[in-house]
Amino acid sequence: MSVETFTPAPLHFTQGAASKVKTLVDEEGNPRLKLRVFVTGGGCSGFQYGFTFDEDVAEDDTIVEREGVSLVVDAMSFQYLVGSEVDYQEGLEGSRFVIKNPNATTTCGCGSSFSI
């Protein structure tokens, strides 16, 4: 009898998010840009997500690649994001990158604030 161990990806970068990052990077004309996801203190639930584009990668950053583009997370933020999904959604309320975080015990209606 064999036993298989399943190790989930530490961070899931969806096809939709990667496609949007690729479009935005192409529009900027700078292939060195990467989507940086970070967590800061604040928001109505204690922590909040942030997104920015960055050319630099620190030694302790985690990098997830998909479709030729990269998502980058700093070491401090990564501990709060393990197992999360980074996606891109378009709807009546507008378009935005979103994080589905299984570690969050409380989230705010805005979708960008959470607590653990």
UniProtKB/Swiss-Prot annotation:
GO MF annotation: an example: 2 iron, 2 sulfur cluster binding
Required cofactor(s): iron-sulfur cluster
GO biological process: iron-sulfur cluster assembly
Ranges annotated as spanning the membrane: none
Gene Ontology CC, one term: cytosol
Cofactor, how bound (note): Binds 1 iron-sulfur cluster per subunit.
Keyword Cell inner membrane: no
Keywords, alphabetical: Iron, Iron-sulfur, Metal-binding
Keyword Iron: yes
Signal sequence bounds: none
Binding positions (iron-sulfur cluster): 44, 108, 110
Top-rank lineage group of the source organism: Bacteria
Pfam families, alphabetized: Fe-S_biosyn
Role this protein plays: Required for insertion of 4Fe-4S clusters for at least IspG.
Family classification: Belongs to the HesB/IscA family.
Subunit structure: Homodimer.
Matching PANTHER family: IRON-SULFUR CLUSTER ASSEMBLY 2 HOMOLOG, MITOCHONDRIAL
Official protein name in the record: Iron-sulfur cluster insertion protein ErpA
Gene expressing this chain: erpA
